[in-house]
């Protein structure tokens, strides 16, 4: 039975400008949110060369302190050495490939593989091999833990599995470095432990929703009560930015009204930022929400084509004032409700994208962040322009990027 022609090409909106991307006004096809081969290419071309946040330098203050990040079948340890330097390694023993560290964080003078007892120091060097004589002329210096690139961006530690020539985190955030300076990232401390929240959706849906300003007034009544309709969105080459100012009009909701009341002045912030909520999203999957009272970091990591893991942790400047403690608790209550609303929305989208009836959807000119993200994905994986899924095995013939930095 022949399928009906795709109605989307006949829609009059949007009309591309001369020399513009003909797909600029359209979403990614539905099949890209559920296809295993597409995820495999995303893993190689997007996630392996992208920066991923692990922790803050204050989370590993002493020699031997470490944090672990697991994603796309890799496990990375960020660790402070006895010399005070921060390094990152693959969490894989060089003997038989066993994972070494199970804890999400901790402190250890040595890392010992639980399989055969190979031991590494805090700089990743191989220092102990049981029954070493049996390995002949084993070069200990050549069998340390595999290093992983690490970048310290104003106190936050990012890792990158592969360098494809793309920019540093500092370069990506350069347009906003003066804006965030007042928040004193280097002095932040964690308010709690890392939280992991599994979601039965494709990872892109979480990011699409995060940068979507149009749904705020429809699906988040609490944010509308707090900010009215004054929610801004912009997209730059590597970063999306969203923002809204807390209104003076008391909310009808108790937690929101209490937050408006108790939120104290932050002496380190200029007047225009005392009531401003700002959100940044770095390509491809990292976000940080900047509030006057705290800063929340979040990333969404793919598990399968229809499963993702949200990893998040809040940070703040030390402040013992009762009003600030109350504001931070109320912030959590407000955003817990927002997260519940978003969870329902993204699961609704994933369910809809499972239908063969959906190919692509038109994007408003106001959806600047989503337009930009879709364009980046199409640049990295050209098959994302296809309205229908290619035949099985299509990814094996996908043209390589020929050394082009996908993050440039």
Task: Identify the role of each PLM range.
Residues 49-60, 129-133, 279-284:
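Short Pro/Gly-enriched beta-strand edge/turn motifs at strand-loop
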Residues 47-51, 98, 215:
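Generic structural signal for secondary-structure transition and capping sites
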Residues 33-37, 49, 71, 88, ...:
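Generic alpha-helix structural propensity
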Residues 8-36, 98-114, 146-154, 228-264:
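N-terminal short leaders/motifs
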């Amino acid at each position: 039975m022949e399928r009906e022609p795709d109605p989307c090409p006949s829609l009059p909106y949007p009309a591309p400008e001369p020399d513009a991307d003909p797909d600029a006004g359209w979403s990614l096809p539905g099949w890209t949110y559920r296809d295993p081969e597409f995820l495999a290419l995303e893993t190689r071309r997007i996630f392996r060369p992208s920066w991923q946040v692990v922790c803050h330098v204050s989370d590993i203050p002493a020699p031997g302190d470490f944090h672990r990040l697991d994603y796309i079948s890799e496990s990375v340890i960020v660790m402070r050495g006895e010399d005070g330097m921060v390094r990152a390694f693959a969490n894989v023993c060089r003997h038989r490939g066993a994972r070494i560290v199970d804890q999400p964080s901790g402190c250890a003078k040595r890392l010992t593989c639980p399989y055969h007892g190979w031991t590494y120091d805090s700089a990743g060097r191989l220092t102990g091999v049981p029954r070493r004589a049996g390995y002949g002329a084993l070069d200990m210096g050549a069998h340390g833990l595999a290093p992983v690139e690490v970048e310290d961006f104003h106190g936050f530690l990012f890792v990158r599995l592969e360098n494809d020539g793309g920019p540093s985190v500092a370069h990506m955030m350069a347009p906003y470095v003066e804006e965030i300076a007042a928040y004193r990232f280097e002095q932040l401390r964690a308010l709690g432990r890392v939280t992991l929240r599994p979601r039965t959706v494709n990872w892109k849906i979480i990011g699409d929703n995060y940068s979507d300003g149009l749904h705020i007034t429809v699906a988040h009544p609490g944010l509308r009560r707090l900010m009215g309709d004054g929610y801004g969105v912009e997209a730059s080459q590597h970063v999306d930015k969203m923002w809204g100012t807390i209104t003076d009009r008391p909310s009808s909701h108790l937690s929101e009204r209490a937050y408006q009341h108790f939120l104290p002045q932050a002496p380190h912030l200029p007047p225009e930022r005392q009531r401003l909520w700002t959100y940044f999203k770095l390509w491809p999957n990292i976000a940080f929400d900047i509030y006057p009272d705290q800063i929340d970091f979040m990333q969404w990591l793919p598990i399968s084509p229809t499963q993702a893991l949200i990893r998040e942790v809040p940070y703040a400047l030390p402040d013992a004032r009762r009003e600030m403690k109350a504001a931070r608790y109320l912030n959590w209550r407000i955003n817990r409700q927002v997260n519940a609303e978003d969870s329902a929305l993204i699961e609704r989208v994933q369910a809809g994208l499972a239908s063969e009836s959906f190919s692509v959807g038109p994007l408003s000119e106001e959806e600047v962040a989503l337009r930009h993200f879709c364009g980046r994905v199409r640049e990295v994986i050209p098959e994302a322009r296809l309205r229908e899924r290619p035949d099985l095995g299509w990814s094996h013939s996908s043209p390589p990027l020929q050394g082009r930095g996908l993050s440039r």
